[in-house]
Amino acid sequence: MQDNALLKQALKHPLYEKIQKLNLKVQNSNYTIDDSFNIFCDEKLDEEIKNIALELKPWRKGPFKINKLFIDTEWQSFIKFNILKPYMQEIKGKVVADIGCNNGYYMFKMLEFNPSKLIGFDPSIKYFLQFFLLNSLAKTPIQYELLGVADVPNYGIKFDVIFCLGVIYHRSDPIAMLKQLKQSLNKDGVVFLDTMYIEDEREIALIPQKTYSKIPNIFFIPSILGLRNWCYRAGFSEFEVITTRQTDFEEQRKTQWIDSYSLDQFLDKNDSNLTCEGYEAPKRVYVKLKV
C-alpha cells in the first residue's frame, strides 16, 4: 500500500485493530464464488466476525457469506457483474484495476478469471475496512489502495484493463476523469465503465440543481451520445455500448445491512419512472472503451 493520509487514519481506526487481532486467529480458510463471495473459516470465530461486520455497516456491494453469516447487501451486485461477465476472459493474465472498488466485491468475483494482478482504488476508510475484514479471512492476493481516480495515473503501475463502475457521475469534471483513466492504461488497454444516463437523442447531459435520487454529489448524467463525446474528447477512439439497464428493486433495496434509505425512497411515490426530484429514474449504460 502507498503511504497516504487516509491510510494513516485507517490504521488508527479501532476496527482495524480488531480485524488485525481476528486475522491472527484464522488458521484455516478457503472460498468459493457464485453470485455471492463465500468464505469458509474457523467457526469458533463466527460471533467475533458477525460483531465486526455489524460495526462496518452500511454494506453496499455484495452479497457475501462468511460461514453461516449472510451479508445481504443493499445492491445485488452480481447483476452488474453478470452484464460484464462475457468480457471477463479479457482479464486472464492481465494487470487489472477496479477504480471506485467499494469493498472489493467485483475484484473477489474476478479471481476466478485469473488476472495476474488485481488492484482496487477507493478513498473510503469504511469500504477499505470492509475489504480488510473479508480479505483477512479469504487471504487473496488482491491489493487495495486508499486512493481516488485522480491518483491512479501517478500510481507507478499501468493497467491492461480498468473497471470504473458508478464513478463518473460523482466527478465535477468527467472529461478530466476519462483522461486520467486513459493515462493509466498500458498500450492496447481497455476500460469498462458504467454510468447513469438520460434517454435523449441529443449530445447533452442533465445537471441536477441540488440532488438526484436524493444523492447530492451527482454532477452530470449524460445521454449516451453525450457520454460518447466525452470519451472521444478524452482521447478514446473506440466506444462500444454493451447494454443498458434500468435500476430496479431486485438490484437495489433496503436490507438489515444498511441503516439508510434505498431506491424505494429515492423515487416518486406515484411514478417509479421518476426520481423524487422529478428527473428520469436511474438507468445505467455499460460501455467498453479503447484508445
From Swiss-Prot:
The keyword tRNA processing applies. GO terms for biological process: tRNA wobble uridine modification. It comes from the Bacteria. GO terms for molecular function: transferase activity, transferring alkyl or aryl (other than methyl) groups. It catalyses: carboxy-S-adenosyl-L-methionine + 5-hydroxyuridine(34) in tRNA = 5-carboxymethoxyuridine(34) in tRNA + S-adenosyl-L-homocysteine + H(+). Its EC number is 2.5.1.-. InterPro entries: CmoB (IPR010017), Mo5U34_MeTrfas-like (IPR027555), SAM-dependent_MTases_sf (IPR029063). Carboxy-S-adenosyl-L-methionine binds at K61, W75, K80, G100, D122, P123, S124, Y169, R284. It holds the Pfam family Methyltransf_9. Keywords: Transferase, tRNA processing. It is an enzyme of class 2 (transferase). Belongs to the class I-like SAM-binding methyltransferase superfamily. CmoB family. NCBIfam families: PRK15068.1, tRNA 5-methoxyuridine(34)/uridine 5-oxyacetic acid(34) synthase CmoB. Homotetramer. Catalyzes carboxymethyl transfer from carboxy-S-adenosyl-L-methionine (Cx-SAM) to 5-hydroxyuridine (ho5U) to form 5-carboxymethoxyuridine (cmo5U) at position 34 in tRNAs. This is tRNA U34 carboxymethyltransferase. It comes from Campylobacter lari (strain RM2100 / D67 / ATCC BAA-1060). The lineage of its organism: Bacteria, Pseudomonadati, Campylobacterota, Epsilonproteobacteria, Campylobacterales. The gene is cmoB.
